[in-house]
């Protein structure tokens, strides 16, 4: 597909049936689902997650190099407060299936709230979505026009030409939302941007410390920080449960803590807070009950960057694809987008965060 001399984003809303139908005919005998072949966010299906972009790239005659550079998903904003704003969602982690949840969130932001959304992926040299390829991010140039960026990254080792688009966006003051492992988003081994290995700690407000809860055994129940309960990001963000465990975190004094995460005794939504479990807090050097106090799991910062511009930053250590089965967590992210863009007056606690179609995320690895 050519558009003004370049490959168009793979957007099922803009692809005509004359283009979609041959692709569906190719994929339907294997996938068994015509709707899933329409390039929407059902990348979360294990089959489509691995072959959809590759199959589409092949059908369109793209080389592997072209696929790596161009393959991203674009959702055109419909009616809503975000009309005219561009949100770029960047996936790339080996554990928590950000390649599944970010398309779902992008579609919510576009369909329900009017934002134009572009989702970027990590792919391998065959053009398949492959979060294990730490050097890959598709269509990084999309960040050049971003009004806000959502990252769900872990130990990325991007080339300078890709890092430049992210760093330039950060320096011009673009609001950034960091999910889960984005506290340790980069592990750059060469190039001009290795100082961004500490982006989590220095900018978002925390780096990788430890699993405070038992990994794959203990869940996380969000509890609003009483002193900040009126913060707009928290409006309507209720009954949050994440089946990813609580991270150890100590945001800096200038951070506004919005929510803490009680360590629960199982991964079930009705699980109870653990009692009597103690661990050494690395920030304080003291042994404490894991829930007294509970660890911060969501906070904001407003920080001046080296170019003199101020970024609004929102970080949550929740964010596995399975965590986003929680309506409250989805609403907190939508609220975070509006807050990041200075649109607090558009937050009413009733944001529609219903996924478009099914959302059946894969459990994290």
Segments from the language model and where they lie:
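Hydrophobic h-region of N-terminal signal peptides that target proteins for export
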Residues: 57-65
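Helical hinge/lid and interdomain linker segments adjacent to catalytic or ligand-binding clefts
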Residues: 68, 73-78, 88-90, 94-185
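Extracellular ligand-binding/catalytic regions of CAZymes and related secreted enzymes
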Residues: 68-82, 100-101, 111-112, 267, ...
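Acidic, Ala/Val/Gly-enriched low-complexity intrinsically disordered segments
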Residues: 11-13, 17, 25, 30, ...
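An acidic, glycine-rich "communication" segment
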Residues: 83-84, 179-278, 349-364
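Extreme N-terminal basic, low-complexity initiation segments
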Residues: 1-15
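Bacterial N-terminal signal peptides that target proteins for export
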Residues: 27, 33, 39-53
